[in-house]
UniProtKB/Swiss-Prot annotation:
SMART domains in alphabetical order: AAA
InterPro entries the record matches: AAA+_ATPase (IPR003593), ABC_ATPase_HisP-typ (IPR030679), ABC_transporter-like_ATP-bd (IPR003439), ABC_transporter-like_CS (IPR017871), MetN_ABC_transporter-like (IPR050086), P-loop_NTPase (IPR027417)
Induction note: More strongly expressed in the presence of methionine than in the presence of sulfate.
Name this protein carries in UniProt: L-cystine import ATP-binding protein TcyN
Pfam families registered for this protein in UniProt: ABC_tran
Species name: Bacillus subtilis (strain 168)
Lineage: Bacteria, Bacillati, Bacillota, Bacilli, Bacillales
SUPFAM superfamilies referenced in this protein's UniProt entry, alphabetically: P-loop containing nucleoside triphosphate hydrolases
Keyword Zinc-finger belongs to the record: no
GO terms of molecular function: ABC-type amino acid transporter activity; ATP binding; ATP hydrolysis activity
Record note on quaternary structure: The complex is composed of two ATP-binding proteins (TcyN), two transmembrane proteins (TcyL and TcyM) and two solute-binding proteins (TcyJ and TcyK).
Location within or outside the cell: Cell membrane
Amino acid sequence: MIEIKNIHKQFGIHHVLKGINLTVRKGEVVTIIGPSGSGKTTFLRCLNLLERPDEGIISIHDKVINCRFPSKKEVHWLRKQTAMVFQQYHLFAHKTVIENVMEGLTIARKMRKQDAYAVAENELRKVGLQDKLNAYPSQLSGGQKQRVGIARALAIHPDVLLFDEPTAALDPELVGEVLEVMLEIVKTGATMIVVTHEMEFARRVSDQVVFMDEGVIVEQGTPEEVFRHTKKDRTRQFLRRVSPEYLFEPKEHIKEPVI
């Protein structure tokens, strides 16, 4: 279980996160939705200390980390439990596809190159890129680059997968291939926290949907509660603007609840 308590973050005078609390059970998929500038990405980056919160506690496996004063050892430990899939891919341009996936295994996990190659090859096969092992990022489509990013995250076998708007930078025609890969990951029982603008994806796969605005959690609950039985006017206003059909038309929910 992951417990996040009272996360605050300021950039100058701008209070971006105002006391965020969230509990995520093992095997849950939590999607975070909301308008641009609401603090979603900053919150996600705080979870592995890519952004250092000004205040707050993160607990994983009963290990409690004070985000204001984490030791180097605690930062390293927390980053080993999590893996981030970035909106802009963050691939090394001078490395091949398989070298990009191997990087975290050989550098952070100190794995032998031969073993790292086998792991990376297996993960790339899972995301349908077994024929692109020796290609460079410049030779890939946006969807393929993001699938490399997903394979890289999966390769280190993290306890929690963090996705920062993984389809936001993609051509609309390429969004589907990335969402299909993510759906397959959901079916494995992975613990996932996903910042997304893909409302149908959020509704179909989530155990919890979290709606953020202006640095706070305005509303959270099951997809049924948030999309169909919305309690807060601000949430309803957002949903009507971005996805009005979800207030009126039920659709299939594919995620089995975590017991």
